[in-house]
Amino acid sequence: QRAIEIGRRLGIQYFALSFANAPEDVDAFRSCIGDEATLITKIESIRGIRNLVEIADKADAILIDRGDLSREVPIEKIPFLQRRIVSSVKARQKPVYVATNLLESMIEWHQPPRAEVNDVVSTLEMGATGLVLAAETAIGGHPVAAVETIRQLIDHFDRWTPNTSFEELLTD
C-alpha cells in the first residue's frame, strides 16, 4: 500500500497486478490505486486463466507472463493458451501484452535465433497490443540491441502485408 501511495504521489498512472487469480483480486487492487489509474492485470496461473473473462472485464489491460505461466502449464501448451488469451481479451476490446522469453537469448548474445524472431512475429500476428522485454533489458548483456531488434520486428510487421513482394522484403 505504501508503494502505491508513493507511486501515485509521483504521478504513476499505470499499475500492474501480479498473479491475479480471481476478479476479487482485481477489485481489491483497484480499490488501492483508484479508478483514474490504469490497471494492467498479469495472467500467470491456471486459476487466472480459468477466471480470465471476469478478470479481463475488471482490468484495463491484460499482460500474459509466459515465464510464470510455464511453471504451472506444460511448455507445449503455452502458445495455444497465449493465442486463446489474446483473442479473448481482444474480443473484449482491451489491450493485451505479452511478456517473458521474447528475446531471451539476447541476455547473452547480440542477435536472437530465428525461433525467437518467429515467436515475436507470431505474437504480433495473433493480435498482441504490445510486447514487454524483461530480463533482456534488466540483466541482459545487450539491452539496446534487444530494444532495437524488437522495434525493427514491429516496424517490419506494421509494413508487411500478404501481398508484399519478395523484392520489397529483400530490399528493406
Language model features: what each stretch is:
Residues 1-172:
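Non-catalytic helical/linker scaffolds that mediate oligomerization, partner binding
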